[in-house]
Amino acid sequence: MIITSLLDTDLYKFTMMQVVLHQFPGAQVEYRFKCRNPGVELAPFVSEIRDEIRALCSLQFQDAELAYLRSLRFIKSDFVDFLGLFRLNEKYIRVSALPSGEIDITITGPWLHTILFEIPVLAIVNEVYFRNTQKVPDFPEGRRRLEAKIGQLQQPGLDSLKIADYGTRRRFSRAWHEEVLRVLCVRLGSDDRRGAPGQFAGTSNVLYAMKLGVTPLGTMAHEYLQACQSLGPRLRDSQVFGFEMWAKEYRGDLGIALSDVYGMSAFLRDFDLYFCKLFDGARHDSGDPFAWGERLLQHYRDNRVDPLTKTLIFSDALTVPRIIELYQRFNGRCQLAFGIGTNLTNDLGYEPLQIVIKMTRCNGQPVAKLSDAPGKNMCNDEKYLAYLRQVFEIPSPQ
């Protein structure tokens, strides 16, 4: 059994799920799976994937897990009570093999009851694929690569550089993920122990944050702002609506805004003085990170907000050398945080799977992301994409 705990997922799933429970309990959604690697055949593993999903749907939260969630300052007690009754329902997810050798995974149902599928299902697909294609994994090579990353991070002048693990969805396996995290805790220290802060800031994975005593990290994902296209009053105001509903729920806590659902220009138009002050910072997830950072810092200055009080989080396909470059550019000008995913939890020398599960519909209408990287778009409704570009004044990709 690959997933043995419903906490084995990213924190932002719970922070978004709490907003769904309190603000949008009736929303109906659809998610679709996509593998971006050409020529990768997942169809032979469909029955294994189905078996693992069936096992996932048998899980419930344990008392110790609920107590841990209750201990997080931003999680409210009625939400924990709800989770005490919660389990994933197999009727909302369909996995099928396609003639091309690819697979189709569709998740359809109430947002509140389907939001927790994405991360464990992606972790299942990854682990099933790699345990079938790499019967004897090269863990010594994985350890050597991890050691090299730690060595790079421990170079002189990088003492205040902190990294976080964002790699649950694309990890090589659960066991490897845990080994990586344990090594990082020992070698890079952690914020919660020994008084002196280390270079390992924490993990997005709630189970391992609990097990290892590190900080769980995360706020919102694209699906939240995408759903607001359907749930908000007017499409043009949907990003503002999303941020305002987030603020209504969290009253200034969990204040990292995701900036690339409509690209940076539309984000900055919507991210006015009020949001500049209310939110702690923003997260970069597509496009040129250096240009993004410079634009955001200038935007803060234009709004008479001191950038040194704000946090820039970078999380787009990061590697350690890229993190060091970004750190050297922005250190001392703002607060910084870096989340590494695939490159941390699936770097054993094999090509990682570029797999995603994205929300494609909410309350019967299409929803989409028009990110700063056109290849990341998932919506196949060209009319809706064109309408979205028009509304947010985004030029068509050439």
Curated annotation (Swiss-Prot):
Disulfide bonds: none annotated. It holds the Pfam family NAPRTase_N. It catalyses: nicotinate + 5-phospho-alpha-D-ribose 1-diphosphate + ATP + H2O = nicotinate beta-D-ribonucleotide + ADP + phosphate + diphosphate. One of its GO terms (cellular component) is cytosol. It is an enzyme of class 6 (ligase). SUPFAM superfamilies: Nicotinate/Quinolinate PRTase C-terminal domain-like, Nicotinate/Quinolinate PRTase N-terminal domain-like. Its EC number is 6.3.4.21. The modification Phosphohistidine is found at H222. One of its GO terms (biological process) is NAD biosynthetic process via the salvage pathway. NCBIfam families: NAPRTase, PRK05321.1. Belongs to the NAPRTase family. Catalyzes the synthesis of beta-nicotinate D-ribonucleotide from nicotinate and 5-phospho-D-ribose 1-phosphate at the expense of ATP. This is Nicotinate phosphoribosyltransferase. The gene is pncB.
